[in-house]
Amino acid sequence: MHPRPHFFSYAAVLVVFLAVTLASAQSQPRPHTKVVALDRAENGILPILTGPPETVTMKSGYVVLEPGRSVGKHSTEHHEEILIVLEGQGEMRFRDGSRLELRARTALYCPPETEHDVWNTSAETLRYVYVVANAQ
């Protein structure tokens, strides 16, 4: 009995598909190590990691807030977020009215789907690093 002609057609298509998929996967840039100086974000945000292809899923930034300033309300959406406070004091304010104190050498965690804002409530500059990663 001879194999059906369609079998060879399907097999050829499958081989081509696998070859293209493998070549595409190998051509995707892979994350690599890097160093970012945290000295250019005066009165703002300096992106440290901007996500794929620079990382797998992670994004981060260095934030500098002058007294009385905030970053603006935003949500973590489908990300987890951690803030590492380097210098200064402030508050993380949540939609429900609750607040967490920020101060130097502390870290704060925000789970996914958390609306929040960061305020500098002191008379000195607030500096922190945030890191977000996909929680799904």
Would you name each region that the model predicts?
Residues 70, 80-104:
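A short beta-strand-loop-beta hairpin characteristic of the jelly-roll/cupin
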Residues 112-136:
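Ligand-binding loop in jelly-roll beta-barrel domains
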Residues 70-72, 76, 91, 107-108, ...:
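Histidine-centered metal-chelating micro-motifs
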